[in-house]
Amino acid sequence: AQSSDEDVVTAEYIGNDATPDTASFHIAVKQLATEQINQGNYLQPDRYQFTPGIYSFDLNTNTNSYEFQFSVDRKDSNADVQQKLMQLINHSKIGLNASMDQNGKGENALVLSSSQTGIADDEDYLFQILPDASPSSMLALKLLGINQIAQEAGNSSFGLNGKDHSSYSYSFMV
């Protein structure tokens, strides 16, 4: 199996026969599958906008629900709080990657992206973040803004021998 443009599509024969069928396929990639990305608010790193205390929020996927708790000390700056959350999410190993984005003003935003790409027709999101019912957790989540979806998950879209197809990921079998 071979591709005429390995930068766009790779082909691999995985059949049982040592000589693959001689049929050829024409694939036209229209759109790659995308992950969900939530981007938080940009905060000034050296400000202290979080009141000391213990906060929590729920992170829901289509199959599981997780509760995250974090504490804020009086010496924790905005950057410290964002860093704590980034490490908390990355160490949880639940299929999300947390990173920090910095704008031209030097402000930081927490960015969460799903490892999974694509989404089923009956799903609205790959993950959703909701605050604890306490007013302080609601305020902290509003300040962080990590519940805001910046990019929805999307399926790949491609034509195979003139017929439209889609897939949750970058790979499929014919």
Question: In which residue ranges do the predicted regions lie?
Answer:
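Bacterial flagellar/type III secretion structural subunits and associated motility module proteins
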Residues: 1-107, 113-174
